[in-house]
A protein has these predicted regions:
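A short, conserved alpha-helix in the catalytic core of glycosyltransferases
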Residues: 59-64, 69-101
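Conserved donor NDP-sugar-binding/catalytic core segment of glycosyltransferases
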Residues: 1-28
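Membrane-proximal basic amphipathic "stem/tether" segments
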Residues: 125-151
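Alpha-helical elements of Rossmann-like donor-binding domains used by nucleotide-donor carbohydrate transfer enzymes
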Residues: 2-3, 77-81, 115, 119-122, ...
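Catalytic core of nucleotide-sugar-dependent glycosyltransferases
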Residues: 95, 108-132
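A short, conserved beta-to-alpha structural element at the edge of catalytic cores
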Residues: 47, 95-108
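Carbohydrate transferase catalytic cores enriched for Leloir-type hexosyltransferases
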Residues: 11-13, 17-20, 51, 131, ...
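A recurrent flexible, glycine/aromatic-enriched loop bordering the glycosyltransferase active site
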Residues: 20-27, 35-58, 62, 77, ...
Length: 151
């Protein structure tokens, strides 16, 4: 809250996240170290770790809520719409903010991972953002794979 109080023009922020073992939270599985947003990043499969993404309510009022037409990727579409399309003032905070257990709807099955990626590509198209299927998957696979080796 103080970050927003001290920066009245800041509209959103996000940080790093650690996924832990589902049954033993002392065992880190994946370190999602993010970075500052660069325009065009969503087209390369990038997005902030959504549990660390905090937004002023005024942004929701101005640009809308989650689009539930995206069954699995509504969080990614929302961040894409706010950050990439509407260019809100967002800041990456290079700190670990969230530690959570592995799981969730997307990672529940390969089918859901496929559906989520398809929905993200559909969202890119719906927002007229350029995307290249090969570039999207190559960047995404490399960046996600590296997260299992970072501590």
């Amino acid at each position: 809250a103080s970050l927003f109080n001290n920066n009245p023009t800041l509209e959103a922020c996000y940080a790093d996240l650690v996924y832990t073992n589902k049954f033993d939270t002392s065992k880190n599985i994946r370190y999602w170290k993010s970075n500052q947003f660069i325009p065009g990043s969503f087209s390369k499969g990038w997005c902030p770790p959504h549990p660390t993404f905090f937004v002023r309510s005024s942004v929701y009022e101005q640009f809308g809520n989650f689009n539930l037409n995206y069954r699995i990727a509504s969080d990614v579409e929302l961040m894409m719409r706010f950050i990439e399309v509407h260019k809100i003032n967002v800041r990456y905070i290079p700190e670990l903010w969230i530690k959570m257990r592995m799981g969730g709807t997307t990672n529940n099955s390969f089918k859901n991972i496929f559906i989520q990626n398809k929905e993200v590509l559909n969202a890119l198209n719906s927002h007229n953002l350029s995307n290249n299927l090969i570039s999207f998957f190559v960047h995404k696979i490399i960046s996600r794979s590296l997260q299992f080796f970072k501590k």
